[in-house]
Protein backbone atom coordinates (compact mmCIF):
# COMPACT_ATOMS: atom_id res chain seq x y z
CA UNK A 1 0.00 0.00 0.00
CA UNK A 2 3.01 2.29 -0.02
CA UNK A 3 2.91 2.79 3.75
CA UNK A 4 6.31 3.33 5.37
CA UNK A 5 6.84 0.52 7.95
CA UNK A 6 8.00 3.20 10.39
CA UNK A 7 4.86 5.29 9.90
CA UNK A 8 2.56 3.91 12.59
CA UNK A 9 -0.11 6.55 12.02
CA UNK A 10 -0.09 5.71 8.32
CA UNK A 11 -0.54 2.04 9.16
CA UNK A 12 -3.58 2.75 11.30
CA UNK A 13 -5.09 4.97 8.61
CA UNK A 14 -4.80 2.01 6.22
CA UNK A 15 -6.22 -0.36 8.85
CA UNK A 16 -9.23 1.96 9.09
CA UNK A 17 -9.76 1.51 5.33
CA UNK A 18 -9.84 -2.26 5.85
CA UNK A 19 -12.18 -1.95 8.84
CA UNK A 20 -14.63 0.21 6.91
CA UNK A 21 -14.48 -2.18 3.94
CA UNK A 22 -15.22 -5.13 6.22
CA UNK A 23 -18.16 -3.27 7.75
CA UNK A 24 -19.52 -2.37 4.31
CA UNK A 25 -19.49 -6.08 3.46
CA UNK A 26 -21.42 -6.89 6.66
CA UNK A 27 -18.47 -8.36 8.52
CA UNK A 28 -19.25 -7.77 12.19
CA UNK A 29 -16.41 -9.66 13.90
CA UNK A 30 -12.75 -8.63 13.93
CA UNK A 31 -9.57 -10.16 15.31
CA UNK A 32 -6.87 -8.60 17.47
CA UNK A 33 -3.64 -10.53 18.12
CA UNK A 34 -2.47 -11.08 21.68
CA UNK A 35 1.01 -10.22 20.38
CA UNK A 36 -0.05 -6.57 20.41
CA UNK A 37 -0.03 -6.70 24.22
CA UNK A 38 3.55 -5.94 25.29
CA UNK A 39 4.65 -8.00 28.28
CA UNK A 40 7.55 -7.32 30.62
CA UNK A 41 8.76 -9.08 33.76
CA UNK A 42 10.12 -7.17 36.75
CA UNK A 43 12.95 -8.34 38.98
CA UNK A 44 10.42 -9.71 41.49
CA UNK A 45 8.80 -11.84 38.77
CA UNK A 46 5.65 -9.74 38.44
CA UNK A 47 4.23 -9.28 34.97
CA UNK A 48 3.58 -5.83 33.53
CA UNK A 49 1.30 -5.49 30.50
CA UNK A 50 0.99 -2.64 28.01
CA UNK A 51 -2.37 -2.78 26.21
CA UNK A 52 -1.97 0.45 24.23
CA UNK A 53 -1.44 -1.15 20.79
CA UNK A 54 -4.10 -3.79 21.43
CA UNK A 55 -6.57 -1.04 22.32
CA UNK A 56 -5.64 1.17 19.39
CA UNK A 57 -6.17 -1.69 16.92
CA UNK A 58 -9.50 -2.63 18.49
CA UNK A 59 -10.74 0.97 18.53
CA UNK A 60 -10.25 1.24 14.76
CA UNK A 61 -12.86 -1.49 14.35
CA UNK A 62 -15.20 -0.43 17.15
CA UNK A 63 -15.22 3.07 15.67
CA UNK A 64 -16.95 1.76 12.55
CA UNK A 65 -20.02 1.40 14.74
CA UNK A 66 -20.84 -1.91 13.07
CA UNK A 67 -18.72 -4.47 14.90
CA UNK A 68 -20.27 -6.83 17.44
CA UNK A 69 -17.43 -9.10 18.55
CA UNK A 70 -13.67 -9.04 19.11
CA UNK A 71 -11.79 -12.30 18.53
CA UNK A 72 -8.47 -12.97 20.21
CA UNK A 73 -6.51 -15.82 21.74
CA UNK A 74 -4.88 -18.81 20.05
CA UNK A 75 -2.81 -19.79 23.07
CA UNK A 76 -2.09 -23.37 21.99
CA UNK A 77 -0.55 -25.04 18.93
CA UNK A 78 -0.26 -28.47 17.36
CA UNK A 79 2.84 -30.57 17.93
CA UNK A 80 5.22 -31.84 15.27
CA UNK A 81 3.39 -32.48 12.02
CA UNK A 82 0.95 -29.61 12.46
CA UNK A 83 -2.76 -30.35 12.18
CA UNK A 84 -2.16 -34.12 11.90
CA UNK A 85 -0.32 -34.21 15.24
CA UNK A 86 -1.92 -35.90 18.23
CA UNK A 87 -0.46 -33.17 20.44
CA UNK A 88 -1.93 -29.79 21.35
CA UNK A 89 0.54 -27.75 23.39
CA UNK A 90 0.32 -24.40 25.11
CA UNK A 91 2.59 -22.07 23.18
CA UNK A 92 5.41 -19.85 24.44
CA UNK A 93 5.11 -16.08 24.84
CA UNK A 94 7.66 -13.28 24.36
CA UNK A 95 8.35 -11.26 27.51
CA UNK A 96 10.89 -8.49 28.05
CA UNK A 97 13.03 -9.20 31.10
CA UNK A 98 13.36 -5.75 32.69
CA UNK A 99 16.60 -6.33 34.68
CA UNK A 100 18.54 -7.58 31.62
CA UNK A 101 16.61 -5.78 28.88
CA UNK A 102 16.49 -9.03 26.91
CA UNK A 103 13.43 -10.68 25.42
CA UNK A 104 12.80 -14.16 26.80
CA UNK A 105 10.25 -16.85 26.01
CA UNK A 106 7.96 -18.05 28.79
CA UNK A 107 6.05 -21.31 28.70
CA UNK A 108 2.28 -20.92 28.57
CA UNK A 109 1.81 -22.73 31.87
CA UNK A 110 3.93 -20.07 33.55
CA UNK A 111 2.70 -17.07 31.57
CA UNK A 112 -1.06 -17.57 31.20
CA UNK A 113 -2.04 -17.77 34.91
CA UNK A 114 -0.65 -14.24 35.31
CA UNK A 115 -1.63 -12.89 31.91
CA UNK A 116 -5.22 -14.07 31.48
CA UNK A 117 -6.69 -12.57 34.68
CA UNK A 118 -5.07 -9.23 33.78
CA UNK A 119 -6.52 -9.47 30.27
CA UNK A 120 -9.99 -10.14 31.67
CA UNK A 121 -9.74 -7.16 34.00
CA UNK A 122 -8.63 -4.91 31.14
CA UNK A 123 -11.46 -6.10 28.89
CA UNK A 124 -13.90 -5.49 31.72
CA UNK A 125 -12.59 -1.95 32.27
CA UNK A 126 -12.97 -1.23 28.54
CA UNK A 127 -16.47 -2.76 28.61
CA UNK A 128 -15.35 -5.26 25.99
CA UNK A 129 -15.48 -8.46 28.04
CA UNK A 130 -18.99 -9.43 26.97
CA UNK A 131 -18.04 -8.69 23.36
CA UNK A 132 -14.90 -10.85 23.31
CA UNK A 133 -14.50 -14.46 22.18
CA UNK A 134 -11.25 -16.29 22.88
CA UNK A 135 -9.52 -18.96 20.79
CA UNK A 136 -7.63 -21.97 22.18
CA UNK A 137 -6.26 -23.72 19.05
CA UNK A 138 -7.48 -23.76 15.47
CA UNK A 139 -9.38 -26.83 14.24
CA UNK A 140 -9.01 -29.53 16.90
CA UNK A 141 -10.10 -32.90 15.53
CA UNK A 142 -10.96 -36.33 16.89
CA UNK A 143 -7.30 -37.42 16.83
CA UNK A 144 -6.13 -34.56 19.09
CA UNK A 145 -9.26 -33.45 20.92
CA UNK A 146 -8.14 -34.76 24.34
CA UNK A 147 -5.04 -32.53 24.67
CA UNK A 148 -7.11 -29.68 23.21
CA UNK A 149 -9.64 -30.22 25.99
CA UNK A 150 -6.82 -30.02 28.53
CA UNK A 151 -5.59 -26.74 27.05
CA UNK A 152 -9.11 -25.31 26.98
CA UNK A 153 -9.70 -26.35 30.58
CA UNK A 154 -6.40 -24.71 31.63
CA UNK A 155 -7.52 -21.42 30.06
CA UNK A 156 -10.92 -21.70 31.75
CA UNK A 157 -9.31 -22.26 35.14
CA UNK A 158 -7.17 -19.14 34.65
CA UNK A 159 -10.00 -16.98 33.30
CA UNK A 160 -13.49 -18.49 33.61
CA UNK A 161 -15.03 -15.22 32.38
CA UNK A 162 -13.65 -15.68 28.86
CA UNK A 163 -16.06 -17.11 26.30
CA UNK A 164 -14.14 -19.69 24.25
CA UNK A 165 -14.51 -20.16 20.49
CA UNK A 166 -12.76 -22.43 17.99
CA UNK A 167 -13.21 -23.81 14.53
CA UNK A 168 -13.67 -27.52 15.24
CA UNK A 169 -13.59 -30.82 13.39
CA UNK A 170 -15.00 -32.88 16.24
CA UNK A 171 -18.07 -33.08 18.46
CA UNK A 172 -16.21 -33.76 21.73
CA UNK A 173 -16.18 -30.19 23.03
CA UNK A 174 -18.85 -30.25 25.72
CA UNK A 175 -17.85 -28.28 28.84
CA UNK A 176 -14.77 -26.94 27.03
CA UNK A 177 -16.24 -24.51 24.48
CA UNK A 178 -18.96 -21.87 24.46
CA UNK A 179 -19.02 -21.07 20.72
CA UNK A 180 -18.74 -24.05 18.37
CA UNK A 181 -17.69 -23.40 14.75
CA UNK A 182 -17.79 -26.53 12.56
CA UNK A 183 -17.33 -26.63 8.80
CA UNK A 184 -20.46 -27.21 6.77
CA UNK A 185 -19.59 -30.83 5.96
CA UNK A 186 -19.02 -31.66 9.63
CA UNK A 187 -22.25 -29.91 10.57
CA UNK A 188 -24.00 -32.12 8.02
CA UNK A 189 -22.31 -35.33 9.19
CA UNK A 190 -22.79 -34.77 12.94
CA UNK A 191 -25.87 -32.57 12.89
CA UNK A 192 -27.60 -34.38 15.76
CA UNK A 193 -24.58 -33.98 18.04
CA UNK A 194 -24.25 -30.29 17.24
CA UNK A 195 -27.96 -29.71 17.79
CA UNK A 196 -27.62 -31.41 21.18
CA UNK A 197 -24.77 -29.02 22.00
CA UNK A 198 -27.09 -26.13 21.14
CA UNK A 199 -29.79 -27.51 23.43
CA UNK A 200 -27.20 -27.49 26.20
CA UNK A 201 -26.70 -23.77 25.71
CA UNK A 202 -23.73 -23.63 23.34
CA UNK A 203 -23.71 -21.11 20.52
CA UNK A 204 -23.31 -22.58 17.02
CA UNK A 205 -21.63 -20.95 14.03
CA UNK A 206 -20.31 -22.51 10.83
CA UNK A 207 -17.37 -21.46 8.72
CA UNK A 208 -16.40 -21.37 5.08
CA UNK A 209 -13.02 -22.87 4.15
CA UNK A 210 -10.45 -20.54 2.61
CA UNK A 211 -8.86 -23.21 0.40
CA UNK A 212 -10.76 -25.33 -2.09
CA UNK A 213 -11.92 -28.69 -0.79
CA UNK A 214 -14.09 -30.96 -2.88
CA UNK A 215 -17.41 -32.33 -1.72
CA UNK A 216 -21.15 -32.24 -2.26
CA UNK A 217 -21.76 -29.02 -0.31
CA UNK A 218 -21.40 -25.98 -2.60
CA UNK A 219 -20.99 -23.44 0.22
CA UNK A 220 -18.16 -25.29 1.97
CA UNK A 221 -15.36 -23.23 0.42
CA UNK A 222 -14.87 -19.57 -0.48
CA UNK A 223 -13.85 -20.37 -4.06
CA UNK A 224 -15.17 -23.26 -6.16
CA UNK A 225 -13.75 -23.96 -9.65
CA UNK A 226 -16.43 -23.42 -12.28
CA UNK A 227 -16.02 -26.98 -13.57
CA UNK A 228 -17.02 -28.27 -10.11
CA UNK A 229 -19.96 -25.94 -9.69
Please tell me what each predicted stretch does.
Residues 179-229:
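Catalytic-core region of carbohydrate-active enzymes that cleave or remodel glycosidic bonds
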